[in-house]
């Protein structure tokens, strides 16, 4: 059994954004192996995301981003307005807009299968991670992409 220090737990927390106790439990289970602990935390995140799927997410935000001649607008829902005001939630929504502009998916299902803007994971995996970190159901309700100039 590895000797887990507070520094180890803090480093894992800094990498993942997940609570100290969850990080400590994952490190103990992984016998101090940080990469294995991250895998354990991802698996737990997926399980928690599935458990929260039936909840109602009626709050949230609508955001818009323009890059060149491409504009994207998205609605992302959360269970409470408190989460909608959270900086990491808002950053996630901005990154979703960047992902939409880069990939131009046809619908929400295609967006979920797209590579997230960081290139390391899919949008679906990042969404599950956000649900685990924030602790509430988060759902991508809808989005639209306008390519070119709109005239009225």
Where are these regions (language model features)?
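N-terminal assembly/interaction segments in proteins that build large macromolecular machines
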Residues: 2-152
